[in-house]
């Protein structure tokens, strides 16, 4: 090997490795942009607010209240609608035009809005609903809802959704969807709901509506 070749080999060995490419920076959520996205209809479409109201407090019992929900939970649901992991003939087309940043902006906008209080309506079931929510049904291995969603329904940020004040009709429908395998994006909730009958689901859903 010639001197020039040796010199080149030594230089190559000593040349510092190039730094790895930096990961793309995560852009901070912009609730103001989220407000615009939520309340503005896309071309040939309808706005999110048309079903959930301008501040996320849906007045229609089958449409969920989104106000004050943990942003991380909303973001996860939007992403799973788009990916098809959570099925909905209404929501899947609604989110297809949204980027991840759009979803983040919308999620943090909704998380910043106060939820309006709800009310329990089923007087004959409220005691059963409270018993299930706070203590579960131990002999059937049904855990207390409060263990994950907190005694007042506030949930745990970035882990478990807020439930307090949610429309009973919506909660009832979601629990049945988990139970019947229609909604399959939470193995934990599917396992719980499969052990509950219609009366128990109705009772706990009504109790949740009155939490605050």
Task: Report each predicted region and the residues it spans.
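Axial heme c-ligation environment in periplasmic c-type cytochrome domains
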Residues: 59-65, 81-121, 157-162, 180-212
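Electrostatic cytochrome c docking/interface patches
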Residues: 13-42, 60, 112-138
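Sequence context surrounding c-type heme c attachment/ligation sites in exported
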Residues: 35-49, 75, 134-146, 158-173
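The feature marks the first
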Residues: 24-83
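Stable alpha-helical elements in mature extracytoplasmic
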Residues: 30-33, 47, 70, 77, ...
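The canonical Cys-X-X-Cys-His
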Residues: 45-54, 106, 142-151, 204
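N-terminal export/targeting leaders of redox proteins
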Residues: 1-28, 79, 199, 209-212
